[in-house]
């Protein structure tokens, strides 16, 4: 598996933790070593519209994706839901937790459980029409990702 971390101003120890987390999570989620060895995951840390997003890379086959981009907005994770600033340890924990959540979505893409179709995302062949944030958190693929 090829993992590339794109970030600025992260110390080496934290970058190593990100690599280790990615390797560990994917080893647990995707049992087939042959399949894991053919995966490519680019993790980008930058401003984004959500805390995190896992997506199929635009150059890969959408029916059997093997190349993925994970975008994490580490700036959004600096404060909790109540507006309090997190210390460095809490922030690092939230970043790793968000990375793990997005890697579950990568696993869902790899195993064919989650797929991108014309009408949007389909989970196990069913398209879910989401209108509210509450409905979004009740989606089966989000429930699995949140554990």
Q: What do these predicted ranges mean?
A:
Residues 93-94, 109-142:
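Post-HEXXH active-site segment of zinc metalloproteases
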Residues 3, 78-83, 126-132:
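A short small-residue
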Residues 17-21, 137, 141-144:
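Soluble or luminal CAZymes and related metallo-dependent hydrolases
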Residues 1-8:
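Acidic/histidine-rich, surface-exposed loop or edge segments in extracytoplasmic proteins
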Residues 97-110, 145:
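Active-site recognition of the HExxH zinc-binding catalytic motif
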Residues 49-93, 106-110:
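Active-site scaffold of zinc-dependent metalloenzymes
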Residues 12, 16, 89-94, 98, ...:
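Soluble non-cytosolic domains of exported or imported proteins
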Residues 8-69:
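Auxiliary, metal-adjacent structural segments of Zn-dependent hydrolase domains
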């Amino acid at each position: 598996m090829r993992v590339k971390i794109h970030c600025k101003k992260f110390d080496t120890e934290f970058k190593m933790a990100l690599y280790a987390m990615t390797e560990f999570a994917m080893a647990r989620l995707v049992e087939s070593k042959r399949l894991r060895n053919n995966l490519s995951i680019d993790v980008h840390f930058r401003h984004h519209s959500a805390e995190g997003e896992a997506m199929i890379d635009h150059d890969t086959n959408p029916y059997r994706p093997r190349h993925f981009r994970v975008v994490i907005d580490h700036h959004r994770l600096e404060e909790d839901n109540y507006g309090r600033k997190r210390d460095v340890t809490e922030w690092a924990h939230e970043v790793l937790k968000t990375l793990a959540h997005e890697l579950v979505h990568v696993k869902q893409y790899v195993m064919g459980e989650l797929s991108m179709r014309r009408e949007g995302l389909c989970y196990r062949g069913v398209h879910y029409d989401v209108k509210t944030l509450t409905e979004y958190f009740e989606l089966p693929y989000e429930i699995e990702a949140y554990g």
